[in-house]
Amino acid sequence: HDVIIPDLRGYGESSAPANDAGNTTYSKRTMAQDMADLLTALDISRADVLGHDRGARVAYRFALDHPERLGKLGIIEIVPTADFWASWTADLAMAAYHWTFLAQPAPLPERMIGADPVAYVDWTLAQWTLSKSLAAFSPAALDSYRAQALGPARVHAMCADYRAGASFD
């Protein structure tokens, strides 16, 4: 098998275009189309698709929108977005606060993260670990996460992704 591991738009080394008013620029449908376009550019007619976290949401959308291009589908560690929102409880809201925070209208979360991006990333990552520390992360991984938060276009893209999840998706 050949393995292709693209960054989703706005993440990693991908482009980070400005969002549109309808939150479609970072919708999973748009990103699934990005994946279909990538396969076309690589002259691949069908592919087995595996996705994790945000990528799993895109993989799921790819399967729905492009079934003729899908061999097998693997989804890792997600609940469908609509089910996630429908299951919202106080405990979940505290654990997954970033879903509502990042989905707030621009530029509120962008400005708040931009005030101290490294502190935001470090605190958020630590809260997701059992030990509530950064001990589970290698220095290289932390550097990568922090670098993303230091780029205003990347932060806007991250927020736009969550805005799409709270609206268009």
Predicted regions and their residues:
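The serine-hydrolase catalytic nucleophile loop
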Residues: H1
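Flexible "cap/lid" subdomain of the alpha/beta-hydrolase fold that forms the substrate-access gate
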Residues: I4, Y11-L50, R54-D169
